[in-house]
Amino acid sequence: MTVTAQQGDATLEQEISAVGKESPLPALASLHDLQYFDSLQTFSYSTSPTANQAFTDFSGVEELSHLERFSMNGARPETLEPLSHLSQLKQLSLTECGTLDLTPLEGLEQLESLTLSSNDRIVSLEPVTKLPALRSLSLSSGTAVPSLEPLAQTNLAVLDLGLGVGQSGLYKEIDYSPLSQLPDLVCLNLTNHTRVTTKFCKQILAHSPDLRFLNIQNTPASEGSALDVEYLRAYTEADLLKRLANKLRNTFG
């Protein structure tokens, strides 16, 4: 179990390693005590989902009006409503958190980065269309979604949909066409998506002029020779990194 909290320039980090089967400290059960850290800017908590199934309530975090970064791994929140009060939140990571309804996140106007990797399911991606500053979204490592259609209404620069080996079935009924409607894309990860073809990749390239990183490892497109990406090779590695840095700087400020 790892807990990290940052307040201003001071960082408190606590790492607990269990020698036997039991941890020296009980698993986190409540966030209410965080109210005493009223200037907290960063909070991160990670534990095994099986060891922390009782942690289902995010209540208390709404008191952290200065919080900019919140990361939680292994919880099973019944609702994300407490997060809706974090008006300064810029980065949010919820991993291995079961099934998530993102509706309470609507209106987080400062949120730039949202990581939802390794969850069971996202009820709907519609709420991400109500996040005007969102530029980076990760749904990697087996997080199931009902549709990618809402993504066409976003201004994403970074999108990670990478799957693990054997997870391609999660997308067997998914319409990929919204991915060709993201003109601001810089980075796209489609690893292990077995329905991604060369033809579709051409559509993405045609409609995403800023795209510089496209991962199609273990897809049908990676086996074809017809995918014309010569314009991507026209830049040196240093130039690519410079362009990406400038793009992300303009995106995230």
PLM feature segments, named:
Residues 1-60, 66-104, 110-178, 184-224, ...:
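Concave beta-strand-loop units of leucine-rich repeat
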